[in-house]
Amino acid sequence: KDGVQYFEEKIPLGNAGALFKIRNLLGKEPFLLLNADAMFEVDFNRMLKFHKEHKALVTLFTHPNSHPYDSGLIVANEKSIVEEWLTKEDARPQWYKNRVNAGLHIIDPSVLDMLSINEDDIGREINGKVVKVDLDRQILKPLCGKGFMLCYDSPEYVKDMGTPERYYAVENDYKKGIVSAKNLANKQKAVFLDRDGTINVYKGFLRDIDEFELIDGVADAIKKINNSGYLCIVVTNQPVIARGEVTYEQLDMIHKKMETLLGLDGAYIDGLYYCPHHPHKGYEGEIPELKIDCKCRKPKPGMLYMAEKDFNISLSDSFMVGDGENDIIAGNAAGCRSVLIA
């Protein structure tokens, strides 16, 4: 009702100093903080619902990108709680999840009151330097591991357009309708990929991370999916969990290796689902509670239905690609167009 209000800095205050200068205008409700040089089309109602349901004080919009090796990485646990924020300069693990901060944030104003930053000092010269506030270094990174900053993973369109080259690329995407189509309020199209024998070289039951090897050309194929407007989602049976041959942590590391190797070649996946179950009993070291006839193990279509719900996917406009009969049966059962590869 008050229209657009502006705060003009007389001198540069850093990329977050202005927040403290307008603290009295922010009230008590969460606010949206955006990078001004980004093009985005996001279902913010969905993101805000996530923020409130998880009782977060800060929610970061995160997504995979085509160059995670030189991007800042967000490390989170299985509950999406941010544990680490690795800048481009920080040492990083050998294998990592391709998850990057996109520069869209939902922030509870109370966060500003929790920080040891004196609003009166911002903009003043102290010890020969003007006091500024850096959003990432002084506000967000210190919240890592505290339990109330979460990451919101989404494949929606968010791209920096701060250089002429990036601006023209974004302009081209906008003209093609790609920007608006990626909003999760709209039905999405996906290419579902099996893992073993489709993405990585088939080794039977893959138990050793050192045996994971991308098939030649698969990164280029996935890049084509990334550039097509389709989501790229992996759906894989992993009975090695139920058989007690691989732990959840070991499987997670294998998938981090997959994402790292794809990222080095400029490719990424938008989602990953795996079935840890196995219906047959009698294996030494097996996990009894996982030895069940579930709804997610292919050839049943359960994992595709999970993705349908999470990403608002139109299954009839999507593809299932795999090297086995179970992949084709699952895709057909979900209403996808299925492709068997040799």
Residue ranges and their predicted role:
Residues 2-77, 115-116:
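Conserved beta-loop-beta/alpha segment of the NTase-like Rossmann-fold superfamily
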Residues 12-13, 38-41, 158, 198, ...:
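A short, conserved beta-strand element in the Rossmann-like catalytic core
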Residues 22, 37, 51, 74, ...:
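Residue-level signal for inorganic ion chemistry
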Residues 30-32, 39, 45-52, 63-68, ...:
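Catalytic-core segments of class I nucleotidyltransferases/pyrophosphorylases
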Residues 31, 287-289, 295-325:
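Conserved Lys-Pro-Asp/Glu-containing loop-to-beta segment of HAD-superfamily phosphomonoesterases
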Residues 187-232:
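Active-site neighborhood of HAD-like aspartate-dependent phosphohydrolases
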Residues 218, 222-258, 268-282, 331:
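Substrate-recognition element of Asp-dependent hydrolases with the DxDx(T/V) motif
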Residues 319-342:
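Acidic, Mg2+-coordinating phosphoryl-transfer loop and its flanking beta/alpha structural elements
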